[in-house]
A protein has these predicted regions:
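Exposed, interaction-prone regions of secreted/extracellular proteins
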Residues: 1-93
Length: 93
């Protein structure tokens, strides 16, 4: 089985530049709590209707200079991920 979470920004580049559309709060994941958008306590429901922590979490980003994602886990937040970015910026022309 596989479960996917995702986000998308349409980038048609009408002026030849990457869109300035933000994802999430417009801040990169590495800016962390208080800046970047996040999901925490990510869980799935198994066939017995029990909440379980997801296994084998992975990430995929096409243009990490424009938008990115980072996963982690700890005792307070369980499994979490930070995501987002500003879109067009000096490293994402």
């Amino acid at each position: 089985s596989m479960i996917e979470w995702g986000g998308e920004v349409v980038n048609s580049e009408p002026d030849g530049k990457h869109t300035s559309t933000q994802m999430g709060s417009g801040h990169f994941p590495e800016e962390g709590f208080g800046k970047a958008s996040y999901f925490r306590n990510v869980q799935v429901v198994d066939s017995s209707n029990n909440l379980k922590a997801p296994k084998g979490l992975g990430t995929f980003t096409e243009q990490s200079n424009c938008y990115d994602v980072q996963t982690g886990s700890n005792g307070d937040w369980g499994h979490y991920f930070y995501f987002g970015g500003p879109g067009r910026n000096p490293n994402c022309p």
